[in-house]
Amino acid sequence: MRLQILLRGFSSTPQTGFPRGDPVRLHGNTTTGLPIPLRNSSSNQILLREGRGDYPDGARRETRRYYQGPTPTPRSLSPPIYRPPPSYEESRRRRKLRRRQDGRVKYPASPYRTKPPGETSSDDEDEGRGGHEPRPQRRLPRGLRDRGERAPERRRPPVQEGEEDVDGVGALLDDLKLYQEPPGDPVEDSDSPGSRLTPAPPDLSRYDSTRLQVDAESSPPRTPRPAPTLVAECTPGRPSPQTGSGQQALGEPPSRPSRGHCRDPRTACLLIIKGSSNQVKCLRFRLKSWHHSLFSYISTTWQWVPSVGSNRIGRSRILVMCEDSAQMDRFLCTVKIPAGMTVEQCSMASV
C-alpha cells in the first residue's frame, strides 16, 4: 500500500513555472495569475511593439506599428497601402475629367481645327468653349516662311511739270535695281572650276554712252574735280619700259632713272619698284617708317595675274607717287634701293 502511494507521488508531473492563481486584468487584458512584468523587461518590450505596455517614464501611450500620423480612426487601423504616383497620362485624364465636370475648357474654339465633312459647329458648342474669338494665325519663323511674291519694285518718282527727263536714265535704273535679278539667262563663270552660275549683266548697248548733261535750270552745273596727272614721259635717249630693258639680273646694282625726265616740274611722278615679295614688303615698311616725307602716296604689294586663273606672274611690285620732279630727286638720292630690285619711272600705261 505504501509502495503504491510512493509510486503515485513520483509518477505525478511536477508543476513548472509560476504558480497558477485566479485570472487578473493587466492593462485591460485578461491574463492568468502571472505577475506584472517589469517596465524594462523583455516582455514589456514585446508589449510596446504590439501597442501595449508601459514606457519607462510611467505613462501609457497609444502606439501603432505601421502608421505614423494623427490619432488613428477605425479605417486607419490597418496598415496603409502604398500607391505609386499617377502617370502623366492619368493625371492629364483626371484634369480633363474635372474640367468637364466643372464646365471649363482649357482652349477656346478655333476655326483652324478640322472637322468631318457635313458636321458644323453650333452656337452651344461655341458658348461651351468660352465664346472667345478665334486665335490669330501663328507667325512662322523667318527661315520657314513661304517665299511668295517679291516686294513691289522700286520705281522712280514721277517727273513733275517743268522738269526734263534725260533719255535712257529711267530705263537704265529699272535694269539696275538693287533687289531684282538682271534679265538674261545665267551664264557659267569661267574663273570657278565648279558649275556655279552667275546672272548675265544687263544689256546696256541701247543706251547712249555719251555723258549725260542736266539742264542748267533743274540743277546748277558742277565743276569736275581735276584728277592728279600720273603720266610722265621718258627722255628720248632712254628706252621705253615696255621693251623690257628695265629688267635687271639678280645681284647687279639697281638701275636708277635719269634726272630731268619730267618736262613740267609740277607734274606728279610715278615710280615702280620691283623685286621679290619679301624685299618689296621690307622696303615698303622702311619707306613708311623713316622716309614718309619723300613721297605722297605708296601702294600695297601687288602682282599681275592672267585673264584666266589666279596664278601670279612676274615679281612683286609697289608704286610710289611723288608730287613733282624735285621730290622724286630727293627720294632717289636719299633712299637706298637694295640689290636685286629695280626702280623705274613709269606712266599708267607701263604699270
UniProtKB/Swiss-Prot annotation:
User: Subcellular localization, per the record?
Assistant: Host nucleus
Keyword annotations for this protein?
Host nucleus
Cross-referenced InterPro entries? E2/EBNA1_C_sf, Nucleotide-bd_a/b_plait_sf, Papillomavirus_E2_C
- Please name the GO terms that the record assigns under molecular function: DNA binding; DNA-binding transcription factor activity
GO CC annotation: host cell nucleus
Pfam families in UniProt? PPV_E2_C
Metal-binding among keywords: no
- Bias regions of kind Polar residues — which residues? 28-46
Query: Which intervals carry biased composition (Basic and acidic residues)?
Result: 49-65, 143-158
UniProt region (Disordered), positions on chain: 11-262
Biological-process GO terms, alphabetical: regulation of DNA replication
Main localization category: host cell
Q: Which domain of life is it from?
A: Viruses
Q: What does this protein do?
A: Plays a role in limiting the replication of viral DNA in keratinocytes. Recruits the host NCoR/SMRT complex to viral replication foci to mediate repression of both viral replication and transcription.
Family, per entry: Belongs to the papillomaviridae E8^E2C protein family.
Q: What is the recorded name of this protein?
A: Protein E8^E2C
Source organism per UniProt: Mastomys natalensis papillomavirus (isolate African multimammate rat)
